[in-house]
Curated annotation (Swiss-Prot):
Origin species: Buchnera aphidicola subsp. Schizaphis graminum (strain Sg)
Co-factor requirement: pyridoxal 5'-phosphate
GO CC annotation: cytoplasm
Gene3D superfamilies attached to this UniProt entry: 3.40.50.1100
Domain of life, per lineage: Bacteria
Name of this chain's protein: Tryptophan synthase beta chain
Cysteines joined through disulfide linkages: none
Length: 399
């Protein structure tokens, strides 16, 4: 029996081989104990403050909104050590791994940000680290691959399937099922079998707690909307968490990729079906026969065919709204923020920003306050963007 509820409504659960159940029960017990342990909590927040660099600022974008009555604030997770929100929860999971006397970390990564974060935490806590990454993502994210290796991680190229995050998740789970007695599987998002979605939310909820305190200090009121990109959904659930019971619109932005109508997207909440995948019941992209379909996004971190179960639940009860943004729209937002504010966002975060800009342009005279979770910085994406812009320039020249 579990100690915590493994479901969010009808979503979630523990759909894994029987061999992994003892590992999940052990993880849940240690997590429950850690929540009650004041020394664990004190140590965790000490690492967040003095190692990771929390709290992160809430930045008002004056240039971006000039000429409108909209005020857009960025929650600056890009300024966290490691370059993204991922660092928050890996510190917590690494501490749990040490508490459970594990010697090795197994992780999966898409954009490489979770891989970098896992390598950071493993180095800090003197743990071996093995990271599974799709071969396509290795090509797309070479700077992050080098960072991981520099910090002592072994990066395993996954050649099977579509060679992206979905396949890396599958290989990491296979490894863990063989080695769970000595290894901890450090999931990078608020997805997977219970207790992972609950653990990741707990170790990311300070994003929302800080943002609420900061917006009240700056605006003396809560925002009209919180906007965050959604792949697996950890940055979104982290910032949503402290606003779920408030009168604030929660907007998750999925990748529309090349356009929903093309089928090349990663938007399972609005264009998928409920199914079992990655140890959980949630929304996922499926064929008529029930096979997992390939997801698509310019952003490796959103290139995932499913989503965390709490997002499926929030969607089903209409507490959060989920929309989608295309590659082209995200790329435009990436360039606009870089030029207007001198902040280069991750392509993942650019999806959330693009939707905020869409709302702003829709009614520029409306007084409204948005918080966009800038979940990561765009250093990792500059080579991808450069190549796309080069191709675009060549097309224009040939016209």
């Amino acid at each position: 029996m579990t100690l915590l509820n493994p479901y969010f409504g009808k979503f979630g659960g523990m759909y894994v081989p029987q061999i992994l159940m003892p590992a999940l029960y052990q993880l849940e017990k240690n997590f429950v104990d850690a929540k009650k342990d004041s020394n664990f909590q004190k140590s965790f927040f000490n690492y967040l403050k003095n190692y990771a660099g929390r709290p992160t600022p809430l930045t008002l974008c004056n240039n971006l909104t000039n000429g409108t009555k909209t005020r857009i604030y960025l929650k600056r997770e890009d300024l966290l050590h490691g370059g993204a929100h991922k660092t928050n929860q890996v510190l917590g999971q690494a501490m749990l791994a040490v508490k459970m006397k594990k010697k090795e970390i197994i992780a999966e990564t898409g954009a490489g940000q979770h891989g970098v974060a896992a390598a950071i935490a493993s180095a800090l806590f003197n743990l071996k680290c093995k990271i599974y990454m799709g071969y396509k993502d290795i090509k797309r994210q070479s700077p992050n691959v080098f960072r991981m290796k520099l910090m002592g991680a072994e990066v395993v190229s996954v050649e099977s399937g579509s060679g992206t995050l979905k396949d890396a998740c599958n290989e990491a789970l296979r490894d863990w099922s063989r080695n769970y007695q000595k290894s901890h599987y450090m999931i990078g998002t608020a997805a997977g079998p219970h207790p992972y979605p609950t653990i990741v939310k707990e170790f990311q909820k300070m994003i929302g707690e800080e943002a609420k305190k900061q917006i009240l200090e700056q605006e003396n009121r809560l925002p009209d909307a919180i906007i965050a990109c959604v792949g697996g959904g950890s940055n979104a659930i982290g910032i949503f968490s402290d606003f779920i019971d408030e009168d604030v619109n929660l907007i998750g932005v999925e990748p529309a990729g090349q356009g929903i109508e093309t089928g090349k997207h990663g938007a399972p909440l609005n264009h998928g079906r409920t199914g079992i995948y990655f140890g959980m019941k949630s929304h996922l992209m499926q064929s008529q026969e029930g096979q997992i379909e390939k997801s698509w996004s310019i952003s490796a971190g959103l290139d995932f065919p499913s989503v965390g179960p709490e997002h499926s639940w929030l969607n089903s009860i209409h507490r959060a709204k989920y929309v989608s943004i295309t590659d082209i729209e995200a790329l435009e937002a990436f360039q606009i923020l870089s030029k207007k504010e001198g902040i280069i966002p991750a392509l993942e975060s650019s999806h959330a920003l693009a939707y905020a800009l869409k709302l702003m342009y829709l009614d520029p005279k409306k007084e409204q306050v948005f918080i966009v979770n800038l979940s990561g910085r765009g250093d990792k994406d500059i080579f991808t963007v450069r190549e796309i812009l080069k191709k675009t320039e060549k097309k224009h020249e040939s016209l």
